[in-house]
């Protein structure tokens, strides 16, 4: 399981360090794709396969299903870490997530998310205020 928040930098070649605590669970190869809220989603292969199976079952006759799967899969790229524990993030993905220099890497259960520092701080500030309300609306168990 992925959890925690880490701050890292993207270098001029588009490489960034993946936190050591995430490396083993990500495995030798993993998938990076466009996520929701202008961040990147990073999945270990086993989780990616589960997600792929679920998304294949969406009705392709529905316009929204086609749009979502196109968006999600067209941005996906298989990646691996170099010897220094860095991943090279493709330019279109960096542009999508507005990754320039500083970024935030967070663990979210079965995936990792990569955010620009600015977008993460903005998202967190907005979400922090409504966290209790969000939890009340979606969570059906005691925290």
Curated annotation (Swiss-Prot):
> InterPro entries, per this entry?
MraZ, MraZ_C, MraZ_dom, MraZ_N, MraZ_sf, SpoVT-AbrB_dom, SpoVT-AbrB_sf
**Signal sequence range:** none
Q: Where is the SpoVT-AbrB domain positioned along the sequence? A: 5-47, 76-119
Q: Please, which domain of life does this record's source organism belong to? A: Bacteria
What GO cellular component is one of the record's annotations?
A: nucleoid
Q: Which PROSITE patterns match?
A: SPOVT_ABRB (PS51740)
The listed locations are: Cytoplasm, Nucleoid
One GO molecular-function entry: DNA-binding transcription factor activity
One Pfam family, short name: MraZ
Q: Which Gene3D superfamilies match?
A: Transcriptional regulator MraZ domain
GO biological process terms, alphabetically, are: negative regulation of DNA-templated transcription initiation
Q: Which family does it belong to?
A: Belongs to the MraZ family.
Name the PANTHER family for this protein: TRANSCRIPTIONAL REGULATOR MRAZ
Q: Spell out the subunit comment.
A: Forms oligomers.
This one is known as Transcriptional regulator MraZ
Q: Per the UniProt entry, what species is this protein from, by scientific name?
A: Halalkalibacterium halodurans (strain ATCC BAA-125 / DSM 18197 / FERM 7344 / JCM 9153 / C-125) (Bacillus halodurans)
What is the taxonomic lineage of the source species?
Bacteria, Bacillati, Bacillota, Bacilli, Bacillales
Gene name, please? mraZ
